[in-house]
């Protein structure tokens, strides 16, 4: 009984100790709120990132210009150790300077369409008939042999358009947040579905066949988007990566679904359709290397330890990369500025070094952040699989905070299956309940750079954000522009994140970690 009582007292004492060190500092939060909500610069930062230096395709000259601007801005604010860290090789970059597409027969109409990134130039203004290639296997391809040259190839059928009886933008409601909060901790990820490899293999053969037949261009209509919104990403090569200078690539474009459907219906009626198209594009980045932007706010007594915040700086090429991810980049830069102003106002210095990272190559597979983790925290195989940890640095990072889900305000944090941080983050969220930040979920979320850190046994977190019109209108689309950023939401996000980062830097201990099977290796 005495042993049980002593154990209970120990648990209670430990809990009180945890609560004490994680109680939010009201002096810090007051200053953070003032500089984040009342003296915000986030929309001006976003305008520079998007209006002046958008879009920022990895490997493009515009990304290089944006990188120079970001470094200068961070230095002017007073951040330390501002520098670039190389990763790669990535391969060739790309930019386009002119694009047009028209239907010229049976009647004229201008077409809304955009080239896919890494498409080569056409040979001036080219004109030809549209052909629909319908093939389910290699035998079907034989009937198209010798028939694609000088043609525009359609690969998609008609996509039905459903009218927007509900608003394309939305906010999370109480039920949404409750469901997230009640979600169980993630289990083991399912094994890869190897049954799908057959279809994937045929798609590779299909594209290799098309490239060999040398049509004028391949055109699709995307799987979503309407009302002139076109979602566009990168071209495909006959094999391998389009960034490989030796890859064979033909012009490719995505057309608005309304125009694509109209042309398809004309062809169904036996009416030939002729298009004209011109694309002027240039391959760039001859050395093949890319860079992440790194900047720091020095720590004090625990300066050898680090807390990181970051966002990907690169974008796709048809909009200006505003919600993806100029918003996240602007917020993380603004959060860093807020922390600097808070330090000046309060005289309270962070104990750990705060390190900002603006990643590149995220849109091609988290390449910049994975390269950084490889250089600092983990040993990887040639294929990129993490094999062991570089303990000297990996043991000194407390955590990484990421933002990459659009313009929406922060509603909480995805804990990425890490129960140890729940009481800590609950305490840190509490002062921002009035701003709508209330929810913690054990759920994982993917598709962005915190995964690179999580994979290396480092606490890595993405914030829960309001969806707004991210998936329906702006993500990877031609409408991803500054005008779709919500100022009050971005102010709130920068404020909440600045508080989380600074409180992480002030803790006596690093953030709790999940169990990992990864072992220490060579540094």
Region roles according to the model:
Residues 26-60, 231, 314, 404-408, ...:
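N-terminal capping segment at the start of a domain
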Residues 44, 338-367, 400:
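Short helix-loop-beta-strand segments that form the rim/entrance of peptidase-like active sites
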Residues 5-17:
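Bacterial N-terminal signal peptides
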Residues 188-199, 204-207, 211-212, 217, ...:
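Active-site-adjacent substrate-binding region
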Residues 108-110, 123, 146, 150, ...:
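Metal-dependent peptidase/peptidase-like ectodomains
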Residues 1-5, 21:
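Positively charged n-region of N-terminal signal peptides that target proteins for export
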Residues 26-28, 113, 117-143, 238-322, ...:
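Soluble metallo-hydrolase cores and metallopeptidase-like ectodomains found primarily
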Residues 22-31, 47, 51-186:
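Noncatalytic luminal/extracellular "stalk/propeptide" segments of secretory-pathway proteins
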């Amino acid at each position: 009984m005495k042993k049980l009582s002593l154990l209970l007292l120990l648990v209670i004492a430990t809990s009180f100790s945890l609560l004490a060190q994680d109680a939010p500092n009201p002096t810090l939060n007051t200053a953070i709120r003032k500089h984040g909500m009342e003296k915000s610069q986030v929309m001006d930062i976003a305008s520079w990132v998007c209006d002046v230096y958008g879009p920022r395709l990895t490997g493009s000259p515009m990304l290089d210009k944006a990188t120079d601007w970001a470094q200068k801005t961070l230095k002017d604010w007073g951040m330390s150790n501002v520098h670039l860290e190389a990763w790669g090789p990535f391969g060739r970059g790309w930019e386009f300077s002119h694009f047009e597409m028209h239907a010229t027969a049976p009647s004229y109409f201008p077409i809304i369409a955009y080239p896919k990134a890494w498409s080569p130039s056409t040979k001036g203004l080219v004109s030809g008939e549209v052909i629909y290639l319908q093939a389910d296997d290699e035998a079907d391809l034989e009937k198209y042999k010798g028939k694609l040259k000088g043609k525009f190839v359609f690969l998609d059928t008609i996509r039905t358009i459903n009218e927007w009886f509900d608003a394309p933008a939305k906010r999370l409601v109480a039920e949404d947040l409750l469901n997230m909060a009640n979600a169980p901790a993630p289990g083991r990820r399912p094994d890869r579905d190897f049954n799908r490899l057959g279809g994937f293999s045929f798609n590779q053969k299909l594209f290799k066949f098309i490239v060999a037949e040398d049509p004028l261009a391949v055109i699709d209509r995307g799987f979503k988007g309407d009302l002139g919104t076109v979602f566009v990403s990168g071209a495909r090569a006959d094999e391998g990566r389009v960034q490989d200078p030796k890859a064979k690539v033909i012009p490719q474009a995505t057309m608005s679904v309304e125009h694509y459907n109209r042309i398809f219906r004309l062809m169904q009626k036996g009416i030939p359709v002729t298009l004209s198209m011109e694309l002027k594009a240039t391959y760039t980045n001859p050395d093949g290397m890319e860079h992440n932007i790194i900047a720091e706010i020095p720590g004090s007594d625990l300066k050898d330890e680090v807390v990181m915040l970051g966002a990907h700086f690169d974008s796709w090429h048809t909009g200006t990369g505003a919600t993806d991810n100029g918003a996240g980049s602007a917020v993380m830069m603004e959060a860093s500025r807020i922390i600097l102003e808070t330090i000046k106002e309060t005289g309270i210095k962070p104990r750990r070094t705060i390190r900002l990272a603006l990643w590149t190559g995220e849109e091609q597979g988290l390449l910049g952040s994975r390269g950084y983790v490889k250089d600092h925290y983990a040993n990887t195989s040639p294929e990129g699989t993490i094999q062991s940890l570089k303990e000297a640095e990996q043991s000194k990072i407390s955590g990484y905070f990421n933002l990459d889900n659009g313009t929406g305000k922060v509603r909480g944090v995805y804990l990425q299956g890490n129960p140890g941080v729940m009481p800590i983050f609950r305490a840190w969220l509490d002062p921002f309940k009035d701003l709508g930040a209330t929810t913690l979920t054990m759920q994982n979320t993917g598709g962005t750079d915190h995964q690179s850190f999580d994979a290396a046994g480092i606490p890595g977190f993405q914030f829960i954000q309001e969806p707004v019109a991210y998936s329906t209108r702006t993500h990877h689309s031609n409408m991803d522009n500054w005008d779709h950023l919500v100022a009050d939401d971005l102010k709130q996000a920068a404020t909440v994140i600045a508080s989380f980062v600074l409180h992480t830097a002030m803790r006596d201990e690093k953030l709790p970690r999940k169990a990992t099977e990864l072992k220490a290796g060579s540094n």
